[in-house]
Amino acid sequence: NNAVKVFKFTVKPTIGDVGIRVQDILLLDIIKNNLADRPIHISTTTGGDSNLGLDEYLQMQGLTFKLVPERIYETGNVVNEKVMREHLFNTNTLQTNNYKPYYQPGFKFRGLDDKSNLFFDDNHFRMMQSYRGAYLNLAGYYINKDQKDKAIETLNFMNKIISVNRVEMEDNLFFKMVMIYRQLGAYDQFSKYGMKFVDKVTEKIKENRVSLE
């Protein structure tokens, strides 16, 4: 069978309603010249407006989206579970100097737990939300597959290595996590993090740093 797989997508204007940006043209050129020969990945940190209407074909793998030749919403494979687990759970947190001269899957998290006293600036804060988003997406995958224990395990592990006491969690991610715990029946975690979220938002309201719209 020599049938050629074809996928179609619509590139919407990214400059008003009349044109597309230089970086969009560059990505189109990369896809055109490399799709048949090598994998193409787009960073999860670039924002949805950089995906050129390819969202249906972008599968999450760690902190990148891989361009795949099938609609992820039809297959249910919004994330690559095997790759995600390799990166998010193989963290080598107890072997902080375990560096190798070759590729090893897994993110190395250090100084992000309750025992740390490191300083974090806004760049660190934003990056940690990307990592947390990956854990939440993996948990969502397990929920859709009716694997509740793995979903709870994923959230618990995330909170162990990236403590909300050390690195503040964005309000929308925090609320999403709390409600997932509730959905899964993990009421101890729901109560614990729910109270932390309420305290956090209450403090912001007092300081006029939160919008209730």
Where are the model-predicted features located?
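ER/secretory pathway lumenal C-terminal domains and tails of membrane proteins involved
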Residues: 1-213
